[in-house]
Amino acid sequence: NRFPEGKSESYGQLMDAATGRVLLQDGGFLTTAKWMPKSNRLYYTRTGLDGTELVTVDPSTYQQTVLVPNLPKGRFVFTPDESTLLYTVEEEGPKEGTNLIRVLEPADRIPGFRDRSFIWRYDLKTGLYEQLTFGHTDTYINDISADSRYLLFSTSDRVYTSLPHSRNSLYKLDLQTMAIDTIWEKAPYV
């Protein structure tokens, strides 16, 4: 909704798809809530007493349950079996000295160029939070298998001596054994 003087208001609605009836209208959690991958529940995060809470909502009863009272920071997705959260965590890259700055490539002049994103896993049953990827390139979550066993993730490198400049790699990680299978590596323009 738009109000005078540029003010605005946002809200979310939960509707019964069969009847079109609005079950719940909310300007709070519904604006950020997402559906769980398997169960018929919504989830969202909020600030709690111990930190960020992961909360689930049963839309039929509106009952809210705190699934995790102190959630790690970062962007996450649920695995399809709803037992694990896979995070993308941004880490600050190395800093150069103030007297002499070594520019690795033209984009190195952009603030945050050396920052990297890595994939972490948070087990909802045990609370174990572990880093799955590391290195000098960003890693991106591409997909998770329906049985939640395999993670497809990718990396991207820049090569300025040939066109196209980017080289992409795609890997399959077995989340039980931690074995990696290379789908393709350093493929130009995929």
Question: Language-model segments: which ranges?
Answer:
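A flexible loop/linker signature enriched in serine peptidases of the S9 family
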Residues: 1-13, 26-30, 45-55, 69-73, ...
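Ser/Thr-centric signal marking residues that sit
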Residues: 79, 84, 88, 126, ...
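A short beta-strand motif characteristic of beta-propeller blades
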Residues: 20-25, 63-68, 128-133, 179-184
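Blade-terminus and WD-like Trp-Asp/Gly-His loop motifs, strongest in beta-propeller folds
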Residues: 1, 33-41, 76-84, 142-150
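Short loop/turn segments that connect beta-strands within beta-propeller blades
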Residues: 16-20, 58-62, 123-127, 174-178
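Extended amphipathic secondary-structure runs
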Residues: 38, 122-152
